[in-house]
Amino acid sequence: MRILAAIGTLAIAVAIAASIFFLGGYYSVAATQRDPAIVDWAIGAVRAASISRHATQTPPMPLDVPEIVQAGARAYADRGCYGCHGAPGVDWEKFSEGLRPDPPDLKEIVEKREPRELFWVVANGIKMTGMPAFGLAGVSDPELWAIVAFLKKLPSVSPDEFKAWVGANPAP
């Protein structure tokens, strides 16, 4: 019984200390300061689990069709995705350096994520990251899937290929 009382007292003390720390404004939410590693880890774990759980829609078409990949590249450029994520031969825009967490390197992400997960992220966005919900912005599912097709091909797309697919937009 004493152990339970001690655990309860400790839990209350931790809750009070956490409340003072977070609600007292001691935790900085400034984008100029990086989160501690434990916070990055916790948010990353929650984000990965949430995406995996909610991403249930499967591709309605093959994603390796060249015309779909090229349409996805054009949509990626037209929607300004390169501003935060860059593109083959196109650097990230300067403003993206101020985003926290940093926008991910898509060449790495697309290797780890399934198409259904990429679709879910592009369609629904990610809270507190700057990643918009393009599905709410009126982007159609076929266009979203085309972007996913391009993303899956992204690691092997050369700057010349990308420029040929999108023309002058974005200007490298």
Stretches found by the model and what they are:
Residues V110-M128:
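Short Fe-S-cluster ligation motifs
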